[in-house]
Amino acid sequence: MPLTDPSEPPPRSAALRRWLGNFWPAPLGIDRREHLRMACGAALGVLLSALLARWWANVWGIEAPWMVASVGASAVLVFGLPSSPLAQPWPVLAGSTLSALVGALCALLVPDAAWSGALAVGLALALMVQLRCLHPPGGALALFVVLNHGGGVHLAVFP
């Protein structure tokens, strides 16, 4: 004989646990070797980018951030989702470069950072879509350039 009546609703804790369980992500079908490849690839890609950007900044005597966070976001896309259209060479390179240039232009033309930042992200998105080089970290890069007060166009060459 069951201890609970089937016509009674389940206890609140069980209902809450089931509801919260709906937010838990589905398991990934990626084995440990692929996890390791992704993590090592991203780490090595960021390291190589950082070393190259720092060397380039020293060669040209540029005093600016030699790497920004959007490089890490790009590495997640390139090494974590390599078959994604957003992680292909054209979107990564053109989307980032275009966004940095748009950010520098907006910072130059619009003095208020709130307006300039919003305009930079919106214009960068519109241009990336038009040129088929949509890369989400590009939006972050456009905003970073504005918040860095233009940061110079050199950020477009090595973000």
At which residue positions do the language-model features occur?
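Membrane-helix interface "capping/anchor" motifs
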Residues: 81-91, 128-139
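Internal alpha-helical transmembrane segments of multi-pass membrane proteins
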Residues: 110-136
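C-terminal binding/interaction regions
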Residues: 139-159
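Active-site beta-strand/loop microenvironment that shapes enzyme catalytic pockets
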Residues: 101-102, 130, 142-145
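Acidic, glycine-rich active-site loops and adjacent beta-strand->loop/helix elements
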Residues: 81, 123-125, 147
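Alpha-helical transmembrane segments and their membrane-interface boundaries
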Residues: 2-97, 101, 105, 110-118, ...
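Hydrophobic core segments of transmembrane alpha-helices in multi-pass, intramembrane catalytic enzymes
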Residues: 95, 120, 141-145
